[in-house]
């Protein structure tokens, strides 16, 4: 089972404060573990423009049609001071990894320097921090019914309003997660 380019959708019974009602986009999954970015937990009072200001990056030439007031996500509990930018191709940046044909993750400053300009990738999600699972840990959490999985959908990743991503991700697999009981059993 390889869940790269899939969503993990927190089951209603998952009460961990970071992962409760979360949707995690899995960037890497192999025999050594998994790494992902939470895509629906906005950091309070932090938008892309605030990150650019803190890093003293001024978009030039600025394209006023591109919004920089989008929320920055809490990507996970690890390395919360480190930025991860999920975006659509191209992957011409210094530190980019292609996750799928349509999704790239970049951790280098050069992608930030394109935000707000015509060179910016068409779709962008900025996160601080990431989530990680050791070898076999994610598989065990799946067996314990902590998560649902669904193939990733770019509309949910980049365009669906943040507050609706949990429910919309579950709908990908035909589930209205708001009607699920808090605890699921094994079939």
From Swiss-Prot:
Q: Which residues form the signal peptide?
A: none
Q: InterPro entries from the xrefs? A: AlgH-like (IPR003774)
Q: Which GO terms describe its cellular component?
A: cytosol
Q: Which Gene3D superfamilies match?
A: VC0467-like (3.40.1740.10), VC0467-like domains (3.30.70.1300)
State the PANTHER family in the record: UNCHARACTERIZED PROTEIN YQGE, UPF0301 PROTEIN YQGE
Q: Which family does it belong to?
A: Belongs to the UPF0301 (AlgH) family.
Write down what this protein is called: UPF0301 protein YqgE
